Amino acid sequence: MKAVSAALALSSLAGRVVAWGAVGHEAVGYVAQAFLAPNALDFVQTSLGSKFNESLGPAGPWADEIKSNHAYDWSSALHYVDAEDSPPSSCSVDEERDCADGKCILTAIANYTSRVVDQDLTDAEQSEALKFLDHFIGDLGQPLHVEATKVGGNEIKVKCNGKSTNLHSLWDSGIITVLLNGKSAESWASDLAKRIKSGGVYASQASDWITCADPSATLSRRDLSLREDIWMFLESRAIKPLKCPLEWAKDANSYDCSTVFTYKNGSDLCTGSYYDDAVKTIELQVAKQGYRLAAWLNVLFDGDTNL
């Protein structure tokens, strides 16, 4: 958050940490629930219990809901990584540049990946780790949670259906609200999961969603699987960003250049081509993050992605 006063940063924080809004986070969780392998499903159901209907869907917004509890003030910075780039002309994520203090979503995913399978922790602590993973893997797909410009778009005033909002809120919930028009998160997620299973465009892309592909890397790193990424991390016992979440952050950040920051000043962003492109991006990202969350938990509890 360079060149932003402390007061402004604090005033913007509430908007900054609510990626996708409750509906989007629920949808990510419900998509993931549809692809869980047996052991992962058993852990999720047991860990979340009746309070969350034994499902990642209702648990998805939890990490935003607890922000009103000052005991969790420390978690605010873990919902995003401030990519110091220049959209729409240049987009990039650099771990050393953008997470230099070690307090960002990339290290948070690493930490809670370790904690969710730590048998020395209590059931409650493992459950909390699961809820954070549910939420942070969802957050990672929201392009403005991988962007520093104007406090992740919070300072950029825009319009949606004639109403004033900011770019971050528009991408969190404004466009989703218009798209769903009263439809539930569970129903929306069911549709997205069907697209992944149906043999259509999503199905043809899904295997690529859970790789750690980086065309600029050496062949050995480019071919690193999600399973290898997680197990190498767990064996090292070092809390550092994993390869796959870093590549997924770069993926989300790329939409800041191709879509998010392509708006025209003064135009209503919930109409026309901008809205159409945003809907395609949001649905794709929610589907991706749900599928990735399932793959992540499947590796941890079933030994492989099983997808």
Give the ranges of each region predicted by the language model:
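Fungal secretory targeting signals
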Residues: 1-19
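N-terminal, motif-rich segments that launch catalysis or mediate targeting to/interaction with membranes
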Residues: 17-136, 143-268, 273, 278-307
